[in-house]
């Protein structure tokens, strides 16, 4: 089956697409949130631009890897594992050859999203964000695609901030990222809010953790 890649500039977000993406991104980030028990708040609490800390939406992008339109029904409360099972059952194989910048209708887009990956503009280039995958062996393809987008928009480096306790460092090293620094993140014992980290405001955690800054040269 042939899927397609939708590349959206974040300044072009429409309300219906943002609503779908909030559900999808939270579902994707809930998987490590529940598995490792470090972060206690959803990834998106208010809006995409605010919670992803997007300062320059004109130069920030998100790619959606879409399955073909079908009768799959994705419920708001479905877990990442449940969504993956639904997609594999319907589409044992999916390839991607078509790129688009918009859809005519976003009303059912959530039931097609196999994965998402974005880059946001920062002073040093771009930073990886909104990385979710609900289909086997898709992560590498999404990485390759978004690195290509980074090159096209003139970035020389892509930064990734990852939580060490989520066991992500080796995954990024496999994709030619190198570790730059580690930052201990403490929580306020009373409020459970994370103190003085690179994360957006309002993040609560169940325990102290470590952020790892990683970099890939394009």
Regions picked out by a protein language model, each given a short descriptive name:
Residues 2-23:
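A short beta-loop-alpha structural element at the N-terminal edge
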Residues 26-63, 67-90:
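Conserved GNAT-fold acetyl-CoA-binding loop/helix
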Residues 59-60, 206-215:
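Short hydrophobic/aromatic beta-strand or adjacent loop that forms the aromatic wall/cage
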Residues 97, 106-110, 115-136, 161-162:
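Conserved acetyl-CoA binding element of GNAT-fold acetyltransferases
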Residues 125, 150-167:
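Conserved GNAT acetyl-CoA-binding A-motif
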Residues 133-135, 159-173, 178, 182-194:
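Conserved beta-strand-loop-alpha-helix junction that forms the acyl-donor binding cleft
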Residues 136-142:
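Glycine-rich phosphate-binding loop
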Residues 142-152:
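A conserved short alpha-helix in the GNAT/GCN5 acetyltransferase fold that borders
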